[in-house]
Each structure stands twice: as structure tokens, then as C-alpha cells.
UniProtKB/Swiss-Prot annotation:
Protein name (record): Pyrimidine-specific ribonucleoside hydrolase RihA
Lineage start: Bacteria, Pseudomonadati, Pseudomonadota, Gammaproteobacteria, Enterobacterales
E.C. code: 3.2.-.-
Gene name of this polypeptide: rihA
Organism the protein comes from: Salmonella paratyphi A (strain AKU_12601)
Entry annotation: catalytic residues: H240
SUPFAM superfamilies in the record: Nucleoside hydrolase (SSF53590)
UniProt keywords, alphabetically: Glycosidase, Hydrolase
Length: 311
């Protein structure tokens, strides 16, 4: 039986490719998609979900827009990475359908309530919507199998020296998720910076030759430009968000450790830092499965294989 999932995302080039991967995978049943503000403004990320589902011919999937700002902070966006639309690069279709009138939290709650089995939540943006769901519906916690997030890092930052972008945008929300008691799987920068797509991989995707693989290649052409800055020391572009979906499909290509994770919400230099108790120094029981390594070639091969689904 296919694994039921809800995707909460802020597209974003890598979010868009995570959607492409999920919807090409019969092992997964995408029950709902909700949008969060982050990579771009809430209006643009919602529109980008609708544009991607229009492209993928999946208007049957319920979509709802989420919180317009973090729980306790003003919104920060990453338009320097993802461009004016949030998905700059390819010519994407205009949305062919409308989102649901309710909120992301209402759609998530309804989806959990109606599911006959626990649902996995995949969250590839800031954790605002998921935290609001957890706080407002404690009765539904048992219906959540796990929460798989792209966010955080052990000892790295890509927005500040200490913090990864998604967690930095709403650290209070991320702390609620990590301390919820629900199993959390964390794809942080330690693994996503190893899940790099190289120029040759982009050409491999382009050569698959269907309309979706072509768009993915064009998304990556744009995404690659930001990551050419020599400060990163990257060969290619790190494909952060698809690591969440890839872990659900092929956990064997990832190396993980079970650790306690907390989120710093106060620090002068460390706001938004995920504090991973790697050496078990706190005495706290592990609350997260933390990805630390990936077989890069296996990751690229999985993407290439699933892009052929759209032939």
C-alpha cells in the first residue's frame, strides 16, 4: 500500500523538484499540499504550488495556503536564491485551478482525520504550518506517523554562520516540531550539501527529453547560478528538499544517526541554530533521526529514473 503523505512547502526550485519526485513515485500517495512563506512571499509560494501541479496535471490534489508570517517574527524571504517569482528560469503554466478556501492547518487536520492510517508530513520550508497544526490539534498527533523536514544542520549555516534558512525563518516553530514527541527525520545541510547536482547531471536530465525533465533541467540551470559563488566551494548545486522524498523512497542511500535536537531561539549569534547532541552530552533521549551522509550517485540516479515516469 502506498505511504500517505502531506507535503508542506515553499516553492522554491528544490521544493518544486521534490514535488516532481513525489508525484512520480507510486510508493507515495500525496494526500494534500500546503504552502508556507519562505523562499518567496506567501502569495507567490502558493501560486507556485498551483503552477507545478498544473504542469504535472494533478489538479486533483487538494491545496491550501498557510501562515503568512512566522509565529513570532517578521518574514524573511530568499528571493536572492529563487528569483522574483520563486521559480525563475523555465516558462511554467499559469494555475489551472484554485486552492481550497480553508487554511493549510485546516486542510492538514482534515486529511489526518479522514486517513485510515497515520500520515507522514513532509515539510520542506519553515515549520510554521506544522507547528500551528501540532498546537491546535493535539488530538491528531497520533495520526501523524512522522515529520520529515528539510532544515537545520550540525555545526553549519547557510543564512547565518550558525543557522540554516528554513529554521532561521521560524525557530520557535521548529522547536515546537522537534519537542512534539512525534518522530522527526531531519535532512539538514550536512546531507543536502552532499546531494549536489553537477552540470553533467543537469544534461542527463535534459536528455531524458520529456516536458517535465526539460523543466527540471531549466530550474536547475537557474538554481546553479547562485551556487557558483566560490564562497560555497560547491561543484554543483545542493538539492536540499528532494532529500526528504528520496529518504522515504530509498532510505538505504542515506546514513542517519538518532540524536536529540533542540533549536536556539534566543542567541545573539546562534538564533535558528539546530543544536544536535551528537555525543549524548545532555542526557536527553534522541528525538530525531538526523541524516548525515548520502550516496550522491544513488540520489542522482533516483531522480533520473523517476523523471522517466513523465514520458
Amino acid at each position: 500500500m502506498a505511504l500517505p503523505i502531506i507535503i508542506d512547502c515553499d516553492p522554491g526550485h528544490d521544493d518544486a523538484i521534490a514535488l516532481v519526485l513525489a508525484l512520480a513515485s507510486p510508493e507515495l500517495e500525496v494526500k494534500a499540499i500546503t504552502s508556507s512563506a519562505g523562499n518567496q512571499t506567501p502569495e507567490k509560494t502558493l501560486r507556485n504550488v498551483l503552477r507545478m501541479l498544473t504542469l504535472l496535471k494533478r489538479p486533483d490534489i487538494p491545496v491550501a495556503g498557510g501562515a503568512v508570517k512566522p509565529l513570532m517574527r517578521e518574514l524573511i524571504i530568499a528571493d536572492n536564491v529563487h528569483g522574483e517569482s520563486g521559480l525563475d528560469g523555465p516558462a511554467l503554466p499559469e494555475p489551472s485551478f484554485a486552492p481550497q478556501s480553508g487554511t493549510a492547518v485546516e486542510l492538514m487536520a482534515k486529511t489526518l482525520r479522514e486517513s485510515s492510517q497515520p500520515v507522514t508530513i513532509v515539510s520542506t520550508g519553515p515549520q510554521t504550518n506544522v507547528a500551528l497544526l501540532l498546537n491546535s490539534h493535539p488530538e491528531l498527533h497520533a495520526k501523524i506517523a512522522r515529520i520529515v523536514i528539510m532544515g537545520g544542520a550540525m555545526g553549519l549555516g547557510n543564512w547565518t554562520p550558525a543557522a540554516e534558512f528554513n529554521i532561521y525563518v521560524d525557530p520557535e516553530a521548529a522547536e515546537i516540531v522537534f519537542q512534539s514527541g512525534i518522530p522527526v527525520v531531519m535532512a539538514g545541510l550536512n546531507v543536502t550539501h552532499k546531494a549536489q547536482i553537477h552540470a553533467a547531471d543537469i544534461e542527463r536530465f535534459r536528455a531524458i527529453g520529456n516536458p517535465i525533465s526539460t523543466i527540471v533541467a531549466e530550474l536547475l540551470d537557474f538554481f546553479m547560478e547562485y551556487h557558483k559563488d566560490e564562497k560555497w566551494g560547491f561543484v554543483g548545486a545542493p538539492l536540499h528538499d528532494p532529500c526528504t522524498i528520496a529518504w522515504l523512497l530509498k532510505p538505504e542511500i542515506f546514513t542517519t544517526v538518532e540524536r536529540w535536537v533542540g533549536v536556539e531561539t534566543q542567541g545573539k549569534y546562534t538564533q535558528g541554530m539546530t543544536v544536535v547532541d551528537y555525543y549524548f552530552l545532555t542526557g536527553n533521549k534522541p528525538n530525531a533521526t538526523v541524516m548525515v551522509d548520502v550516496d550522491r550517485q544513488g540520489f542522482v540516479d533516483l531522480l533520473a529514473e523517476r523523471l522517466q515516469y513523465y514520458a
